[in-house]
Design a protein with these regions (language model features):
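Residues that define the transmembrane beta-barrel architecture of outer-membrane proteins
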Residues: 37, 59-67, 89, 102-108, ...
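Membrane-proximal helix-loop-helix units in multi-pass membrane proteins
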Residues: 120-136
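Cleavable N-terminal export/targeting peptides
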Residues: 1-36
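Outer-membrane beta-barrel translocator domains and adjoining extracellular loop/strand segments
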Residues: 49-59, 92-101, 131-144, 172-180
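Outer-membrane beta-barrel proteins
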Residues: 29, 68-77, 109, 113-118, ...
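Predominantly the C-terminal beta-signal and adjacent terminal strand-loop region
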Residues: 91, 144-194
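Repeated loop/turn-to-beta-strand initiation elements of outer-membrane beta-barrel proteins
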Residues: 39, 77-83, 118-121, 158-164
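Short glycine/proline- and aromatic-enriched beta-strand/turn motifs that initiate or cap beta-hairpins
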Residues: 31-91, 95, 127-129, 184-194
Length: 194
């Protein structure tokens, strides 16, 4: 058994994380926000797609639509934390396996947000799930992998919110399909109840 590590990817990922952390530290000095606590529900779409982990080939053939449910609580006036559940569906085709025409991705995770007025910048991580769907009663086994993402957005005092996220999962391995990842962007429009 051998273990391969691509140090270029690890170094690039760590440098992005370090840069993002430094920007957050700089921005948190003048933050005056008071994030809302409560449940949030959002709907949206984007380009969140399964791709071949080796070649980068995309398997999706349509836009992706979905929803998000979260609970947010303030961590002082400058930060908030969320527990989030997001689910998205789209059409797609796998090579050498034509019975599946759609896929479903799910994220169950936690997010930390830094606030400046009504605007926020957030980072999150969690467990990503992927299933290929033939019909409502027939789908592939559900595979899972860790992953992370980042986003930005705003929430109004009346509760309306808009956010944009970039997502990237680790590799899903399955005996049915080639190794895959879920990557892409998603936009969310929603409402948070006090």
């Amino acid at each position: 058994m051998s273990i391969c590590v691509n140090f270029n990817e690890v170094t690039m990922h760590n440098s992005k994380l370090l840069l993002f952390t430094l920007v957050l530290i700089y921005w948190t000095q003048p933050l005056l926000a008071d994030p809302r606590a409560g449940w949030g529900l959002g709907f949206g779409g984007g380009s969140l797609e399964p791709i071949n982990a080796s070649s980068g080939t995309s398997y999706h053939t349509s836009s992706v639509y979905g929803g998000t449910l979260d609970y947010q609580w303030p961590l002082g006036k400058s930060f908030s934390a969320l527990i989030t559940y997001a689910e998205h569906v789209g059409k797609g085709e796998l090579p050498n396996n034509t019975k599946y025409k759609s896929y479903k991705t799910t994220l169950l995770g936690a997010e930390l947000r830094a606030w400046m007025g009504s605007f926020f910048v957030g980072v999150h991580g969690g467990q990503y799930y992927l299933a290929w769907v033939e019909s409502l009663s027939s789908y592939s086994g559900i595979v899972s992998a860790g992953g992370n993402g980042y986003g930005l957005g705003f929430e109004t005092k009346s509760g309306w919110m808009f956010s944009a996220y970039h997502e990237q999962s680790s590799t899903f391995t399955s005996s049915e399909f080639p190794d895959q990842k879920v990557e892409g962007n998603r936009l969310v429009l929603g409402y948070r109840w006090p």
